[in-house]
Design a protein with these regions (language model features):
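Patatin-like phospholipase A catalytic core
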Residues: 1-458
């Protein structure tokens, strides 16, 4: 009974909200025209202003269309607030000789076009060893026609410096349809993205965890409530399968219709514009797109706040890769047991687990190496880390809702990440050496004295 009441609560709230807004509108109308009597007296009201009500509705609709034409549907949300803070905190901190705007603290130089990170072609006598960033987002398909999406309600939608887009099964064959368009011209007709979509925008979409449509977490009542109260971090983007003119604009010209689709959870993958949200609404570890590219070494860091060590995100990624690519990620229960704390106080035997990725059945030469890092404390960790965990029981699995870490909280997470990274580095180097048939040296020890940064911009 309690579960049913919990499910009904959002709908009861919505009904009450609509009734309250209707009564408020009726009260305002009564005051404007000087109508006497109860606001619930509908016959009197209808007799007093039979044409004013439809006229007022038409005026309100016209005003809504005008505003949605002049104000971008993506700007009418908290997305830009979130994006600006991410850019200011992380990208701005790496800019030398930064010259921010005095009042806001922001700078145009903080953000860069995503296409600028593209690895250039090199000659035979040179190799560019920069990493290729892949920013994973979720294409919401809450109302999709494909039966295979009834549970997922989403597809993977990666951003790379070269192109942006998605793939889906071709209903007429066993092949995949690919819809990708250049990142360098996405939104190029807009004054704030003349060189294509910016890194900060793609990063903010990739982290848009709070959205009315959230992949397999989507629910009609939640979509309605979050849209009404404008709790929206997601992004409406032109479909890369559509006209290049719309791709250059990037977002809907008139956003009212698309806002209604967001309100009612009517997102699809074959409309003119697509609704994107946090990549974790499809697959939270970032493994999926790497397996698609058949990477030989994949390092996944699971910071999902999994205090019970159920590894739900890992199991989800393993299932998606198996179903979509036929790739089997093999990681034994013993390996998972090493990173699962036990005893009193609970301590793990390792910071990471290792496994194999079988890309081609029966062909070990195609196998990849999988290294899975998960926050856990070992008895051999530093005394300050172990001491901090005794006074902060949630560490190292604080909820992501907590966005207000103090200095000690931040530093202990950083120190744990460094310890886990150094622990896994030996296995990573050995894996690279095995692939390249080159012996790799030992991992360098921690420096005796940390080298301070020139400047920290928080």
């Amino acid at each position: 009974m309690v579960n049913y009441l919990a499910r009904l609560t959002p709908y009861i709230f919505l009904l009450g909200l609509l009734v309250a807004l209707s009564l408020l509108a009726s009260k305002i109308a009564h005051e404007l025209v000087g109508l006497e009597g109860s606001i619930l007296s509908l016959p009197k009201a209808a007799a007093f202003y039979p044409w004013e009500v439809p006229a007022l509705a038409i005026v309100c609709l016209a005003l809504a269309l005008l505003i949605s034409w002049r104000v971008d549907v993506n700007e009418f949300s908290i997305h830009y607030l979130y994006r600006n803070r991410l850019v200011r905190c992380y990208l701005g901190a790496s800019v030398e000789n930064r010259k921010p705007q005095p009042f806001t603290g922001f700078s145009d130089a903080d953000d860069v076009p995503l296409a600028r990170l593209q690895i250039p072609a090199t000659g035979t006598d040179g190799v560019d060893d920069r990493p290729l960033p892949i920013l994973n987002t979720t294409l919401n398909v809450v109302r999709g026609k494909e039966l295979g999406l009834q549970t997922r309600k989403a597809r993977s939608f990666p951003f790379t410096p070269l192109c942006v887009g998605f793939t889906r099964p071709d209903p007429a064959s066993s092949d995949l349809e690919s819809y990708f368009a250049p990142a360098s011209i996405l939104g190029a007709d807009r004054p704030d993205s003349k060189n294509g979509v910016r890194l900060g925008t793609a990063t903010a979409i990739s982290g848009a965890a709070v959205s009315p449509n959230m992949g397999f977490y989507s629910a009609p009542d939640l979509s309605f409530l979050m849209t009404v109260f404008d709790v929206r971090l997601g992004w409406w983007l032109a479909n890369p399968a559509g006209a290049i003119k719309k791709w250059r604009i990037g977002s809907p010209t008139i956003g009212f219709y698309w806002l209604l689709r967001e309100l009612f959870g009517a997102t699809t993958d074959d409309s003119e514009y697509l609704y994107l949200s946090d990549g974790g609404h499809f697959e939270n570890l970032g493994i999926y797109e790497l397996v698609r590219r058949r990477c030989k070494i994949i390092v996944a860091c699971d910071a999902s706040g999994d205090a019970l060590y159920g590894c739900g995100d890992l199991h989800n990624a393993m299932g998606r890769c198996r179903v979509d690519f036929g790739a089997e990620i093999e990681i034994t229960a013993d390996e998972i047991g090493k990173i699962t704390p036990a005893g009193a106080p609970p301590r793990a035997m390792a910071h990471f687990a290792t496994g194999l990725i079988h890309y081609t059945p029966g062909n070990p030469a195609d196998d990849g190496i999988f290294i899975y890092v998960k926050p856990a404390l070992q008895a051999s960790d530093s005394a300050d880390l172990l001491g901090y965990s005794r006074t902060n029981p949630a560490f190292p699995h604080d909820s992501t809702v907590d966005q207000w870490f103090d200095e000690s909280h931040f530093e202990n997470y950083r120190a744990l990440g460094e310890a886990a990274g150094r622990a896994a580095l030996g296995s990573i180097r050995n894996a690279i050496g095995a692939l390249l048939t080159i012996p790799m040296g030992p991992v360098a020890p921690l420096p005796a004295t940390p080298v301070p940064n020139k400047e920290f911009v928080g």
